[in-house]
Amino acid sequence: MAVTLKKFSADRLDDCVSLLADAFVRNPLHRSAFGDNRLDQNRAFFRIGLRHMFIGPSFMALDDRDGFPCGYVHFNAWPNCLPAPEELPYAVATQLQPLGEAIPQVIRWFGRWCHLDPSEPHVHLGPIGVAPDRQRQGVGTALMRCYIEHLEREKAAGYLETDRQENVEFYKKFGFLLLRAEELIGTQVWYMWRPEDA
C-alpha cells in the first residue's frame, strides 16, 4: 500500500484521534484500563494525548489513494519523553478528568512507565498505530522507518513499550532488544531498547 508521511497538523486532530482509537481499542492495556470495545474512552485518551502529551515529532501516514490518515507515529527525546512520576497528580487534575473511572488504571499504567523510563539518553517511541483495515500492508513499517531514520540522524538510542507479543518480533526487525517483561494492570508488557549503534 502506498503512503506518504507528513508531519501531524492540528487540522487532522479528529482523524488521528479516530484512527488511534480504532488501532488501540483491542490492545490488552487499553482493554484493562478502559474496558472492552470502549472506543469512547480510547478517543478521549488519544484526544488528551494529541492535545497535551505527545510533544515532539509526530507524523501521519496518508493513504495515497484518498489522502486520509491511516497511520500515526510519535517520538520524543529524553528527558522530556514522559512526565516525572511526581507530575502525574497534576496531570490528573488538569488533563485526565475526561477519562473518569479509568483514571486509577491509567495512573498505575503511566506511573509505572514513568518510573521505568531509562535514565540514559534515548528517543521514546509511542504511540505508533495503524488503522485496522490498513494493517499488514507496510504502513507500520513506513512509520518505523521514519523513527529509525530519526534515531540514525540524531545518533540516538531508542526505547518503547508494547503490550502485544507479535509486536516484540516486529520491533526486533528494527534492531530493538528486549529489556524486560512484566504484568501491568492485569496484562503483559514488554520493554525494548535499541542501542545507538544498532
What residue ranges belong to the model's regions?
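Conserved acyl-donor/pantetheine-binding loop and adjacent beta-alpha core of acyl/acetyltransferases
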Residues: Y72-G129, Q135
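Conserved beta-strand-loop-alpha-helix junction that forms the acyl-donor binding cleft
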Residues: G126-Q135, Y159-E169, I185-G186, P195-E196
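Conserved active-site alpha-helix within GNAT-family acetyltransferase domains
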Residues: T141, R153-K155, R164-A181, I185-Q188
